[in-house]
Amino acid sequence: ETIKKALEREIDQGALEVENLGQEIVIRIREKGAFPAGSAFLQPKFRPLVRQIADLVKEVPGIVRVSGHTDNQALDSELYRSNWDLSSQRAVSVAQEMEKVRGFDHQRLRVRGMADTEPLNNNETPSMRSRNRRVEIGILQGKPKYSDEVSVQQAN
């Protein structure tokens, strides 16, 4: 709730969404305004917002997972080999901006490119595709629960 309140203006403007999923808080950055189409270059005017997010989450315990996402459209680019490449590079751009914040522990960062594997919408219309193009900053709170080891015996 503190994060939501601090980012209220950006949420109202449609640049961000904040969602609490229980053990994970997700801050969703829309592509529009953050990156040019088909590019991982984080727009200069958007960098202060990414630093503000890093400043807000630096005191929240847990792993900070930065995930890049794309739509399912083929990429026509000499810079990026695929949507995997583009989504990864966008996540890296955001993570590197977060690292610039004094006191932010980069050891907490995990960066991943998801391409079009976790869409929020189907990709039928341009507006639905635009919602899928995003970077998510997830703060994972709590430790994962691992099951007991299962022994495997070889059959003779």
Predicted features and spans:
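Beta-strand-connecting loop/turn residues
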Residues: Q23-I25, G62, D116
